[in-house]
From Swiss-Prot:
Record protein name field: Cysteine--tRNA ligase
Keyword Oxidoreductase recorded: no
Pfam family, one: DALR_2
Subunit structure, interactors included: Monomer.
GO biological process per UniProt: cysteinyl-tRNA aminoacylation
Amino acid sequence: MDLFLYNTLSREKERFLPSNDPVKLYTCGPTVYDYAHIGNFRTYVFEDLLKRVLLFLGYSVHHVMNITDVDDKTLAGARKKGCSLEKYCQPYINAFFADLETLHILKADAYPHATHYIPQMIEAIQQLIDQGIAYVGQDQSVYFSISRFPNYGSLSHLNLEELRQSSRIDADEYDKDNLCDFVLWKAYDPNRDGEIFWESPFGKGRPGWHLECSIMSMALLGQSLDIHAGGVDNIFPHHENEIAQSESLSRKPFVRYWLHSHHLLVDGKKMSKSLGNFFTLRDLLQQGFSGEEVRYLLLQGHYRTQLNFTQEGLQAARQSLKRLRDFISRLEDPFYPDDIIHPEVGSACQNFLEAFVTSITNDLNISSALASLFDFIRKINGMIDRQSIQEETSSEFSKQDAQHILSLLRQIDQVLGVLPFSQADIPEDVLLLVKEREAARKVKNWKEADRLRDEIISRGFAIEDGKTGMKVKKI
């Protein structure tokens, strides 16, 4: 089935046509000066959804996510703490990978560190200087001359003539009001940088943030990428500058599809420490929420709309996951009768899968996909509720029906990454005790049924009697 994605470059939804196999995917990773916050993870969960959808549709994916371990913020942090850059960044790198696991985010194929690619960055800067595209400023930093790149502003759709343009800027982050030549190599300042610098033909210093991503992506994925994704804040200046650098070096189109997720708000406001609404994943885990609950909340809205993160939203995510957990537990009941997959169940499964795939291939419309999932759950629960456990008829919901649905749920969880499947099978000896208890109940031998219940509990399993039969769960 065709996949359609909204391309920031064209501002249109386009059919995805990869250049080759595998799909070359580059996503902006963390700047490891602190713990990643939930706004960062909104973007990372979106990028994970994108990757999962590609894999679900049968594409092979070569995914690279960078680790920015040298920039204004990391240098300031290391200097303040009085330690090496590596020692300062490593705890935050470790925490980032732990957070990825907690949120069920698939690992990338490579996580290049900016500090490992500085020789390649120096070589690229020299090439740009030789072409007359970059120059050494009076402050001994090296700058990219945006006037030498005619397509500058194409991604962010800037009208260069309407914007105030200054001569140059050496900060890593700035806004559109400061459109200017940007830094490729920041000259060493002992008062600012301490003892952290690299030698180069242009003098001591370190690379600019924008150059780092260009060099690492091209080193590991080649000169032209299929997809580059990140947050909307990265469009300008970061991704705009990446295009200018990369295409000046390669003389080839840098990226075919640009995807960007929108902002995350907290209680309707921009997240900030001063407002007291700044959360890391660790903060939420300490409040008693699970990684699955946080992932579900970050996942459920369309990536190109703002997501309002609230405590009420987390509670709603918890309830949604409970509904999913209860449904799966109901299907995992081992005491449905053996029978065929009934046409009504097969038809419901097929209709649901078609609706789910139609949604995710329409620019990753996960909210529509989740709506179809809960419609499906209501329909199947209705089928199970209608069955009569007293009459063994061919129309009764069967074990094969349940297994077919569970298989389908496992299939779509390749995209969602949140479904709570049971972690332990029920041992045969416990199943035998349950069957004996079921037989005792049918002949109204309540004393024996109670004894068998106690025996089952003693083996670490709970048993619930319901109108559709008995359910067994590990305690």
